[in-house]
Design a protein with these regions (language model features):
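N-terminal strand-loop-strand
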Residues: 1-42, 53, 68-69
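Nudix hydrolase/Nudix homology domain
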Residues: 35-37, 101, 107-197
Length: 197
């Protein structure tokens, strides 16, 4: 048996996507002493008796000060803790679930995150985040693959909306749902091809 512990969304905004820039207490230093900043999807932990969609709506409002429209989707799939991908029955899941993924390490192998597709309503501004990254998924995958810094990402055409200064020399790394998107991009691209246009 598994437990649903969180919800996140791949959120479109002006023909690109919005990704969170993690808070400084989650930054790491690599072996070269460079700061590594996690890039993830907007979302968070389920609280009390919330549904995944209720969690997502709350987190979106807290993190980017706006709401989202959930995009209709009826072909959900799962990414297992062993990184296998399978179709799942939409009747057994939250309405409009895009996919869910499981942790790859104990004790999280039986914990899942529900992922939805969304479209931002209005203009996002980081509230409970330092900033957000605006980019297309292909470019994000290229920058992650090449171990780029935020500055190099900006030179490639990404945009940052921030409320505090963020060290642009910091390297980016995928976390949470973005880590799963990267796995899908590498090995199961057909599952996300509609996001790559």
């Amino acid at each position: 048996m598994f437990k649903t512990v969180g919800a996140s969304a791949i959120i479109s905004y002006n023909n690109k996507y919005i990704f969170e820039i993690q808070k400084s207490d989650k930054w790491n230093y690599n072996s070269s002493g460079e700061i590594e900043i996690g890039i993830g999807c907007i979302g968070g932990t389920i609280e009390n008796s919330e549904t995944p969609l209720e969690t997502l709506q709350r987190e979106v409002l807290e993190e980017i000060s706006t709401n989202i429209e959930i995009i209709k989707w009826d072909h959900p799939f799962t990414v297992t803790s062993d990184l296998n991908v399978y179709d799942i029955n939409p009747k057994n899941e939250s309405r409009n679930l895009f996919f869910h993924w499981f942790g790859t390490k104990e004790p999280y192998r039986k914990c899942r995150i529900c992922v939805f597709l969304g479209k931002v309503i209005g203009d996002p501004f980081p509230d409970d985040l330092l900033g957000v990254l605006i980019t297309d998924i292909k470019l994000l995958m290229e920058c992650l693959e090449n171990d780029f810094s935020l500055n190099q990402c900006l030179e490639k055409g990404m945009k940052i909306i921030s409320k505090e200064e963020i060290p642009l020399k910091a390297k980016i790394k995928e976390v949470g749902t973005v880590k799963t998107i990267r796995e899908l991009y590498k090995n199961h691209k057909r599952r996300i091809k509609h996001l790559l246009k």
